[in-house]
């Protein structure tokens, strides 16, 4: 698979943010990104003068726990749109690798999980806003 360079990703991200802001008549308030994606942050800042908000990863089990907390409380809603079908499908199929379940650091199966990872970063970056206490 072709991985886009930061110069292309920056333009795509900017276009996506503007498209959603226009559609929902709401500006983006916090642009969360994996702290390991420094090159994209640098490119986005160079192109648009805006830094993305970098979030440090926790252990996968702790990232997932935060998402499960929000969902279990019935505090997560999504728009039932064509574009969101991939989000639901990926979360339905998200699962632990059985070979690692009894280890100190269980792993998930890393297939078709982009929206799962993104949602974990969103929740992690907005713990205070979401009223989570860890």
Where are these regions (language model features)?
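Histidine-centered active-site/metal-ligand motif
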Residues: 114
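Mg2+-dependent endonuclease catalytic cores in nucleic-acid-processing enzymes, primarily RNase H-like
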Residues: 1-108, 129
């Amino acid at each position: 698979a072709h991985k886009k360079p930061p110069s292309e990703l920056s333009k795509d991200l900017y276009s996506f943010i503007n498209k959603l802001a226009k559609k929902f008549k709401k500006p983006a308030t916090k642009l969360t990104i994996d702290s390991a994606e420094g090159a994209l942050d640098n490119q986005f800042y160079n192109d648009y003068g805006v830094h993305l908000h970098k979030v440090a990863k926790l252990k996968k089990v702790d990232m997932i726990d935060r998402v499960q907390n929000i969902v279990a409380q019935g505090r997560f809603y999504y728009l039932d749109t064509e574009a969101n079908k991939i989000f639901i499908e990926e979360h339905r199929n998200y699962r632990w690798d059985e070979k690692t379940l009894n280890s100190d650091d269980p792993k998930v199966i890393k297939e078709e999980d982009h929206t799962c990872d993104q949602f974990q970063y969103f929740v992690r970056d907005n713990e205070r806003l979401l009223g989570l206490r860890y």
